């Protein structure tokens, strides 16, 4: 287990419209059984609930690390489509010999063109999808673009959220809370920004895992302190 270090604080008048009620709605944590770590022991690994089969894994922002994608596709006997339009060489190299991982040299966003995809082709074709994303802020336009029906086709998802500061970004997390329960939260210690809203401290970068509401049978608030034993630092620095 590691020490949780409070980073530097940032205050700004733009944040004043973010209320306690909104934070509670977005960050209330629910209890899920069978939490496991998939992927590396540090950055690149994620905590998910082991709840069964999936149609497909959609992964965004892989860079040179597919430890999560490899472990996930092997465990659940499924295929992965992995997207990264920034680290094309590294992404192509790590995926080229993987029979279960198809690499696509596009970024994820809210449009479809030769450089971006909004994943709607997949989100409207499958209804038991796992989504994993670390796309450096691109998660906000992508999630904003989704319909509620498209969100409901995602069985489980894990996102790294980057600098959820102003009200518009919190409204996107509120949107997720309409269809999914938050079952894990982990602050990324590779960034030392923290936001303060009326004496509630929120890290600038954090990972969230969500389960579709119809897939969580016992709706109970989490009673385990964070971080969990299977959590780890993103970086040792």
Language model segments and positions:
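Residues that flank catalytic or metal-binding motifs in active/ligand-binding sites
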Residues: 76, 99, 153, 204-206
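Active-site segment flanking the S-adenosylmethionine/decSAM binding pocket
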Residues: 62, 108-173
């Amino acid at each position: 287990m590691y020490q949780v270090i409070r980073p530097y604080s940032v205050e700004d008048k733009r944040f004043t419209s973010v209320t306690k009620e909104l934070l509670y709605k977005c960050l209330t944590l629910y209890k899920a059984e069978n939490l496991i770590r998939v992927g590396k022991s540090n950055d690149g690994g994620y905590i998910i609930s082991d709840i069964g089969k999936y149609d497909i894994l959609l992964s965004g922002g892989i860079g040179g690390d597919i430890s999560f994608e490899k472990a996930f596709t092997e465990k659940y006997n499924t295929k992965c489509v992995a997207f990264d339009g920034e680290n094309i060489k590294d992404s192509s190299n790590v995926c080229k010999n993987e029979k279960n991982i198809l690499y696509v040299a596009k970024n994820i966003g809210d449009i479809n063109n030769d450089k971006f995809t909004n994943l709607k082709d997949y989100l409207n074709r499958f209804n038991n999808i796992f989504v994993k994303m670390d796309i450096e802020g691109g998660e906000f336009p992508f999630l904003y673009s989704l319909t509620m029906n498209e969100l409901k086709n995602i069985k489980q998802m894990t996102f790294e959220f980057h600098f959820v500061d102003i009200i518009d970004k919190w409204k996107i997390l509120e949107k997720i809370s309409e269809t999914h329960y938050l079952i894990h939260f982990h602050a990324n210690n590779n960034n030392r920004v923290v936001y303060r809203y009326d004496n509630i401290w929120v890290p600038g970068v954090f990972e969230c895992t969500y389960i579709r509401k119809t897939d969580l049978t016992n709706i109970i608030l989490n009673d385990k302190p964070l971080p969990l034993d299977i959590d780890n630092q993103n970086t040792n620095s």
